[in-house]
Amino acid sequence: MTGEKIRSVRKERKSGLDLLEPDEEPAATGPAKHRGSKIFSGGNHRISRSSSSPGDPDGAYPVHECVFRGDVRRLSSLIRTQNIAQKDVHGNTPLHLAVMMGHKECAHLLLAHNAPVKVKNAQGWSPLAEAISYGDRQMITALLRKLKQQSRESVEDKRPRLLKALKELGDFYLELHWDFQSWVPLLSRILPSDACKIYKQGINIRLDTTLIDFTDMKCQRGDLSFIFCGDAPPSESFVVLDNEQKVYQRIHHEESEMETEEEVDILMSSDVYSATLSTKSITFSRAQTGWLFREDKTERVGNFLADFYMVNGLVLESRKRREHLSEEDILRNKAIMESFSKGGSLIEQNFEPMRRQSLTPPSPNTISWEEYITAETGKAPHLGRELVCKESKKNFKATVAMSPDFPLGIESLLNVLEVIAPFKHFNKLREFVQMKLPPGFPVKLDIPVFPTITATVTFQEFRYDEFDESIFTIPSDYKGDPSRFPDL
């Protein structure tokens, strides 16, 4: 197993446990509020009433109730007519409950009907996070595979809209710079910077970068080009060129059985994180300049005149769970992280995860359905293994420079960023600019990319231009190497 692969997996606990995500929509608490949820469940699930229970007087959560009670027979009869993506008053979906309570038959039935895996409850935990806590290896593996499948399907569903938007957008050259910082001692000095060049022509995009992969642990550098060809079959759309070694690799989505098993080993031996950038109280105020006579700050960023704003009310909320870890796991993880903060690597640590067995199940649940569903919102009775959780909140101070002169609109930028989302730091940029920003285009902004790391992104140059089509093709003297970039 390569250090890069391990790094990628520990980075996000891989696909399902993003280190930093924007606020989700508030959990709706009744059937009528879940009309939009059907996109997650692979079908148009009709909401119907069933016989109510004392704790659920409206009968609003029949699927949740039969999962809670472990009633597989009733679940199988309800599942075709009910919304299996619905959240209850505590933000849990039926899949959350099945996993937390160890009702494996219910969980597998829900997964067979494409119940959403990435969705989070009110505490910020996905079903995969809850499965790691419970510790059943088979269930963790099933959820991980379904999560990857749903992620691929989501990309494929967006593809026609994305290609249409790219085709309507003019051809251009865009240059932006990344500078990473951290408030962790010693970490800032090893953090990278990067100058990215983006070429867009028709439905093709090329990104030249020196930073292909970056986590809060380590970065991978090189002279690299990422090419997206919109008219190629999905399996051949994405390719990465290593311009130093003159090799290329197509980005694959399927993983081998061994890779999946290794990923499960790392999930079961690592902390589970939930980090959310809360934007509920966000406000923008004009940045000021001058000592005696204060005035609004307006400066040139690259070729564009921009108004500077202070971003107020951004809060980074993070939670870390480790009830599934042994004392040995905790000490080992701490040693690895200390090595990273000093510039070390996984290879130097000789890190090779051991094959993990399922944990002993937690004590059987003694809470009734009525007690669970009538509990005060935000104070749900805990189900599953006893929590060992640390929580923290950090106010994120940021500035953003908005220019009315930038030729590209934010919506167009979002479409371009969606194409290059495999680069995780670009995905964080996309999430950030989806907020309601002041007027103009964000030519310079601060964004959090990991709980301890922020980046200043500067759009230095933009021009409409035409390019030789050859820059979107693989050079004839490059050789294919399917293992050059294990993280992709």
UniProtKB/Swiss-Prot annotation:
The keyword Chaperone applies. GO terms for molecular function: signaling receptor binding. It is found in: Endoplasmic reticulum membrane. ANK repeats lie at residues 58-87, 90-119, 123-152. The keyword Transmembrane does not apply. Residues 1-60 are annotated as: Disordered. Acts as a molecular chaperone for G protein-coupled receptors, regulating their biogenesis and exit from the ER. This is Ankyrin repeat domain-containing protein 13C. Its main location: endoplasmic reticulum. Keywords: ANK repeat, Chaperone, Endoplasmic reticulum, Membrane, Repeat. GO terms for biological process: protein retention in ER lumen. It comes from the Eukaryota. GO terms for cellular component: cytoplasm; endoplasmic reticulum membrane. It holds the Pfam family Ank_2. It comes from Danio rerio (Zebrafish).
